[in-house]
């Protein structure tokens, strides 16, 4: 059984001995553990959980340096230094006893996540995971996919989540603001129903646009769709009546549907087979985040007549 770890994990820009060159990677996590000597092998073994490490290389001072094989990082380096064994002799009832030998392990991890935009959120979770001292091979934290992502897959998924959040916002906008627009335009509930029905016709248009993606490239069509949807939605802020608003939202909703479809297709293409369900789940969460941000517009939409237009720009 491992001896209790010292409560001395540190996180900061750098924690290297004086005179030693500062490492360019950021951030840095430093852990100090006192463990049983019998458990030392686990610390000298490359990690195979959230990251797959290369076989260690011994530094001049005996420190083991582990590099990156695969993981959601642009940079990763883990250094493990083991101090001399300590053997403690005590007495129990006047009889000398010899305790299990322990060693001091200092682990320094330098990493740079390949997670744009959402990096701070995952950096916080990663630091907590690294400080836990867990060395069970293949044991993944609850917040990570069951299969290791490489830097490209992590970057692509992060950017798709950003686009998904925008798509969730744009796709929810008309249903959350139509009541306020109808009040300003003195439109009846029948007019509102007609507008919402016409907006849903845009789904048919989206199928035509998605078919173009196979010839023109999915990423180019995805970016064009998200930009086009945002621009057309902004035109809705100038609407003098329900017809203008309904027309702009019909095309905007069509492009938003294109965004949702292409995000799903690209995610399936880019993610490893063991992480596709994870990718779908986080994409759904970020789309819900965007929809929730749209609902937040209700806080000011009825402050004044026409205040709902702010949500469109």
Regions found by a protein language model. Name each.
Residues 199-201, 289:
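Short hydrophobic/small-residue motifs within alpha-helical transmembrane segments
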Residues 205-218:
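Helix-to-loop junctions at the C-terminal end of transmembrane segments
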Residues 248-283:
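Cytoplasmic helix-loop-helix junction between adjacent transmembrane helices
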């Amino acid at each position: 059984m491992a001896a209790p770890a010292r409560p001395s994990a540190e996180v900061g820009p750098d924690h290297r001995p004086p005179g030693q060159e500062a490492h360019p990677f950021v951030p840095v996590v430093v852990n100090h553990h006192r463990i049983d000597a019998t458990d030392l092998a686990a610390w000298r073994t490359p990690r195979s959980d959230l990251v797959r490490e290369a076989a260690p290389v011994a530094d001049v001072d005996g420190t083991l340096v582990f590099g990156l094989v695969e993981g959601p990082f642009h940079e990763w380096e883990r250094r493990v230094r083991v101090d001399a064994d300590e053997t403690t002799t005590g007495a129990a009832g006047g009889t000398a006893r010899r305790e299990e030998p322990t060693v001091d392990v200092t682990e320094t991890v330098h990493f740079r996540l390949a997670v744009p935009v959402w990096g701070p959120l995952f950096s916080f979770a990663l630091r907590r995971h690294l400080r836990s001292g867990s060395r069970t091979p293949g044991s993944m934290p609850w917040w990570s996919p069951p299969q290791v992502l490489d830097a490209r897959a992590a970057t692509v998924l992060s950017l798709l989540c950003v686009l998904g959040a925008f798509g969730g916002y744009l796709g929810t906008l008309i249903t959350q603001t139509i009541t306020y627009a109808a009040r300003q335009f003195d439109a009846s509930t029948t007019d509102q129903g007609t507008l919402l029905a016409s907006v849903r016709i845009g789904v048919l248009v989206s199928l035509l646009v998605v078919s173009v993606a196979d010839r023109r490239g999915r990423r180019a069509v995805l970016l064009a769709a998200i930009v086009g949807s945002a621009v057309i939605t902004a035109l809705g802020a100038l609407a003098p009546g329900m017809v203008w608003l309904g027309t702009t939202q019909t095309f905007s909703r069509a492009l938003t549907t294109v965004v949702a479809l292409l995000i799903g297709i690209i995610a399936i293409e880019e993610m490893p087979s063991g992480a596709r369900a994870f990718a779908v789940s986080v994409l759904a969460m970020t789309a819900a985040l965007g929809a929730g941000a749209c609902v937040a517009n209700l806080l000011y939409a009825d402050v004044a007549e026409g205040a709902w237009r702010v949500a469109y720009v």
